[in-house]
């Protein structure tokens, strides 16, 4: 094998490894955002929020854009603002309580350019509330990632609503109040 071939293969491998790392970090974010939180041993939202923040760069941006999400989510710049965003979502729960939501990602596109990357997904998410009300939400994600000290992190989460549709009340008859899937 020539040095040129080895260099080309190395470059291709680096892109593939970067895509895999980005895919894992985006999936971990969605996993941590599920309710109930499936991460074993995470019993409170403050701990969950810190695990989510570990996925972000210090200067990251989290924003909801478009006519539906502008007013609902707005823009949070930096980890402290992102922490406040998640505290408003999980820490200030109102009645009815959110009992179940699960994030499903599809239509993935990841574009790596050295130590930066962008990824786009479509996301579907069923919600079930304690009063029986249920909905299905879909949004598009256009996220940015940056390699920091050899580790890929999220530098921007940008989400735009595709639709919100009601589901039949109590659409899920059986669901866990907590997750034990990852219990050792």
Question: What do these predicted ranges mean?
Answer:
Residues 46-121:
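A solvent-exposed, acidic/Ser-Thr-rich amphipathic alpha-helical stretch
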Residues 1-54:
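Short, low-complexity N-terminal intrinsically disordered segments enriched in polar/charged residues
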Residues 19, 42, 76-79, 135:
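Generic detection of long, well-ordered alpha-helical segments
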Residues 3-10, 95-184:
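A beta-strand edge to alpha-helix "cap/lid" segment located at domain peripheries
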Residues 33, 56-57, 64, 123-125, ...:
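Short beta-strand segments enriched in hydrophobic/aromatic residues
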Residues 39-41, 70-72, 128-132:
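A generic structural signal for short coil/turn motifs at secondary-structure boundaries
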Residues 33, 37, 90-94, 127:
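Structural motif corresponding to the C-terminal cap of alpha-helices
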């Amino acid at each position: 094998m020539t040095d040129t071939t080895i260099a080309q293969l190395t470059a291709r491998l680096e892109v593939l490894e970067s895509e895999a790392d980005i895919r894992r970090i985006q999936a971990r974010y969605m996993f941590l955002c599920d309710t109930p939180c499936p991460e074993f041993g995470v019993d409170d939202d403050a701990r969950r929020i810190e695990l989510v923040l570990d996925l972000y760069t210090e200067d990251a941006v989290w924003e909801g854009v478009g006519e539906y999400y502008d007013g609902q989510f707005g823009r949070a710049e930096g980890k402290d603002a992102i922490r406040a965003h998640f505290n408003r979502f999980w820490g200030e729960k109102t009645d009815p309580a959110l009992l179940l939501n699960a994030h499903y990602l599809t239509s993935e596109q990841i574009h790596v350019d050295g130590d930066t990357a962008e990824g786009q997904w479509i996301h579907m998410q069923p919600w079930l509330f304690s009063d029986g009300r249920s909905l299905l939400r879909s949004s598009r994600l256009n996220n940015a990632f940056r390699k920091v000290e050899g580790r890929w992190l999220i530098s921007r989460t940008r989400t735009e609503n595709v639709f919100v549709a009601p589901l039949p009340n109590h659409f899920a008859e059986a669901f866990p109040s907590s997750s034990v899937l990852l219990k050792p």
